[in-house]
Amino acid sequence: YDSSNPVKPKIINDFSKIEPYSFPHSYSELPNGNILTTFQTKKGLKTVGGIVELDFKGEYLRASDAQPLDETIFMRPYGIVLIPEHNRIVTTNYDMHETDNGYHIQIWNMESLELLSTIKLPHVNGMINDQNPFEGRLLTDGKTVMFQTFSCGLFVLDGVETLNPNITKVFNFADKPFCSVPVRLKNYWIQTVASDSGGFNGLVVLDISNPYNPVETYRLNTGEDIGPHWLSPNVSGEKIVMTGFFKE
């Protein structure tokens, strides 16, 4: 889209796949003005996709496969976090077709698009919060990434600029509901939580001044008819738009 007039955006290109990659999901503008895209698959639901760099008109420039060396690892590139100060990209791992669950994230070299690491989330016995790393956000230090799983765990990734990146679980929003698209505003994390089985629906606000010890500061219950899914702030951060599902 040409969004120079956001009220009347114009389509300048469209695609459902860019051979051999298929099922694009997330888009993020690189420091050079190009667009980075995650493609979940290649030529079928059982294939692993990759990341693709496009120019501002959506034309293919280059790409890199997300297939780990260990081919038993389930990988479907999903969300994108750019870490320009350290030449890194982080992608999460959630299958929109729900053919299986992801338990790993990936770290890439931003300049070359080389896949550097595929890292498994730490598991907590008796819980499933390590399933399906969903959306990540870069923290204020410019190098630490916080991300949540669709299964409502919250994790911190540090050391992306080193040879030994590390993931730490720091919070659990709920046991069974779904945790979708969050917002980070300065040192606050605002998380959507939705349940289709009678659990909590609403927003949870955390003070993440210490990202390894988040403190819940507020919880908004949206009721059984509204399951929050997606959040986006305005430029000033004074207002947040929320979408959701359940009752029409």
Describe the predicted segments one by one.
Residues 1-248:
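Feature marking well-ordered beta-strand scaffolds used for ligand recognition
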